[in-house]
Amino acid sequence: MPRPGKSSYSDQKPPYSYISLTAMAIQHSAEKMLPLSDIYKFIMERFPYYREHTQRWQNSLRHNLSFNDCFIKIPRRPDQPGKGSFWALHPDCGDMFENGSFLRRRKRFKVLRADHTHLHAGSTKSAPGAGPGGHLHPHHHHHPHHHHHHHAAAHHHHHHHPPQPPPPPPPPPPHMVHYFHQQPPTAPQPPPHLPSQPPQQPPQQSQPQQPSHPGKMQEAAAVAAAAAAAAAAAVGSVGRLSQFPPYGLGSAAAAAAAAAASTSGFKHPFAIENIIGRDYKGVLQAGGLPLASVMHHLGYPVPGQLGNVVSSVWPHVGVMDSVAAAAAAAAAAGVPVGPEYGAFGVPVKSLCHSASQSLPAMPVPIKPTPALPPVSALQPGLTVPAASQQPPAPSTVCSAAAASPVASLLEPTAPTSAESKGGSLHSVLVHS
């Protein structure tokens, strides 16, 4: 016996994952964030399957919230009543679902924590590099409490002589590269010359060494200027979206991808430029069929102001340049050029259609129609009943119609016989 309610599928498990159900609830809310209790309520109101065994699936959903990076936890403000934090979707997980369908998920969204750990590791490494006592100064200040005073003084003297050279700057984050590139690195240039000096040498003696390498400094300045120009172009074209590294890339790869995106003008794959832009641009560029040439070969007149319009709409496609060059070459060779001439100066309109016709120059086959007699030949036959004021005998009409119905229309003898018969009848009536 089938289970009751089987036909309606109301008690069946919906084909959505816990991530999809949670995303539905968050997207449906006005503030785009919900506490855990409201997420449970949303699911149970819309899917009767989850009204039973609530503890089981609620535990699973709570684990999905905690272990998936696509959900972020927002603490509750003091002025908001209730308890518990809010849950919202990560700002970068917009393409997590394929074509916006909650049934299919492209891939599991992951926040790139490798970048953050790499940056923290770089900062911890750069701090001791800036001064061997960078993080050890607080401990060495406590050394007099644990060691002898002369031992602490020796350590203090050892750690304060090397920090005379200016420290190198820490590596910037990947999403702040273009901001640092806008300023030419004038300060970090002296450190490469300073390690070659003895520790006791004052930093003022490093200044005469700078003019000894003018080529390297000019090259560094040129590289910095090029990087600043590229960064300015990236900020102008991409905007604030270039601050975020692309999904699935490391710090170095993110910087390279951001630079490539700024130079190639990458659009989102859904943008209209990626859908139809590549098609018509490829036809015009690779196919070698400019607009004026197509109109010319179809027989349409090409106005003179078309060159300005096309040049303003498609400045990267030499539309009118090729037409002007071809027209100049044809005029120099003595070949007539114009809308009414085809290839090699052959007139097209005079061969195919009249000059008054504005259709494209294409030969159209015409089917032959049967020749009809002139209208004047049919008029006497039609006026016979009116002149006689009396219809002819039925036997005469039937015999004439049965004899040859088509011949009475096409042959010129049919109206003559009808006229003669009508004349004889008229004479008989007059004489009687």
UniProtKB/Swiss-Prot annotation:
Compositional bias segments (type: Pro residues): 163-175, 185-202
GO biological process: anatomical structure morphogenesis; cell differentiation; regulation of transcription by RNA polymerase II
SUPFAM superfamilies: Winged helix' DNA-binding domain
Segments for region (Disordered): 118-220, 413-432
Compartment(s): Nucleus
Protein's UniProt keywords contain Zinc-finger: no
Residues that span the membrane, as ranges: none
DNA-binding region: 13-107
CDD domains per record: FH_FOXB2
Cited Gene3D superfamilies: Winged helix-like DNA-binding domain superfamily/Winged helix DNA-binding domain
This protein's record includes keyword Ribosomal protein: no
Molecular-function GO terms, alphabetical: DNA-binding transcription factor activity, RNA polymerase II-specific; RNA polymerase II cis-regulatory region sequence-specific DNA binding
Domain of life: Eukaryota
InterPro entries reported in the protein's UniProt record: Fork_head_dom (IPR001766), FOX_domain-containing (IPR050211), FOXB1_B2_FH (IPR047389), TF_fork_head_CS_1 (IPR018122), TF_fork_head_CS_2 (IPR030456), WH-like_DNA-bd_sf (IPR036388), WH_DNA-bd_sf (IPR036390)
Basic residues composition bias: residue spans: 136-162
Cellular compartments per GO CC: chromatin; nucleus
Biased composition regions of type Low complexity, renumbered to the chain: 203-220
Keyword line: DNA-binding, Nucleus, Transcription, Transcription regulation
Major localization listed first in the record, in broad terms: nucleus
Function: Transcription factor.
Protein name: Forkhead box protein B2
Protein's organism: Homo sapiens
Gene assigned in the entry: FOXB2
